[in-house]
């Protein structure tokens, strides 16, 4: 008997090593992915209201896929760029 269970996405796929190539550190990756996940979540929230302030997912998504998983796949696909933010001059 075969099953049609798909491979899990998100934290295990894409691999962390590939994701770290897009940023300077694990901390930067966490902040980067969290900000994008918030944008995706806000996009879905605003769909019903007709207000589209944020850009929707840049990759194909599944019905029950979480915003963080979508953000990690976008980062891995190279669809987003991360620019370092410089602190205030002292």
From Swiss-Prot:
Keywords: DNA-directed RNA polymerase, Nucleotidyltransferase, Transcription, Transferase. The keyword Transferase applies. SMART domains: RNA_pol_Rpb6 (SM01409). Its EC number is 2.7.7.6. GO terms for cellular component: DNA-directed RNA polymerase complex. GO terms for biological process: DNA-templated transcription. Gene3D superfamilies: 3.90.940.10. Pfam families: RNA_pol_Rpb6 (PF01192). The keyword NADP does not apply. It is an enzyme of class 2 (transferase). InterPro entries: DNA-dir_RNA_pol_omega (IPR003716), Pol_omega/Rpo6/RPB6 (IPR006110), RPB6/omega-like_sf (IPR036161). GO terms for molecular function: DNA binding; DNA-directed RNA polymerase activity. It catalyses: RNA(n) + a ribonucleoside 5'-triphosphate = RNA(n+1) + diphosphate. PANTHER family: DNA-DIRECTED RNA POLYMERASE SUBUNIT OMEGA (PTHR34476:SF1). Belongs to the RNA polymerase subunit omega family. HAMAP family: RNApol_bact_RpoZ (MF_00366). The RNAP catalytic core consists of 2 alpha, 1 beta, 1 beta' and 1 omega subunit. When a sigma factor is associated with the core the holoenzyme is formed, which can initiate transcription. Promotes RNA polymerase assembly. Latches the N- and C-terminal regions of the beta' subunit thereby facilitating its interaction with the beta and alpha subunits. This is DNA-directed RNA polymerase subunit omega. It comes from Streptomyces avermitilis (strain ATCC 31267 / DSM 46492 / JCM 5070 / NBRC 14893 / NCIMB 12804 / NRRL 8165 / MA-4680).
């Amino acid at each position: 008997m075969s099953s049609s269970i798909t491979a899990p996405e998100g934290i295990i796929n894409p691999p962390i090593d590939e994701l770290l190539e897009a940023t300077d550190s694990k901390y930067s990756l966490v902040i980067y992915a969290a900000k994008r996940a918030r944008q995706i979540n806000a996009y879905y929230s605003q769909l019903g209201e007709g207000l589209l302030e944020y850009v929707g997912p840049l990759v194909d998504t599944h019905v029950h896929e979480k915003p963080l998983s979508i953000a990690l796949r976008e980062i891995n696909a190279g669809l987003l760029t991360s620019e370092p933010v410089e602190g205030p001059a002292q």
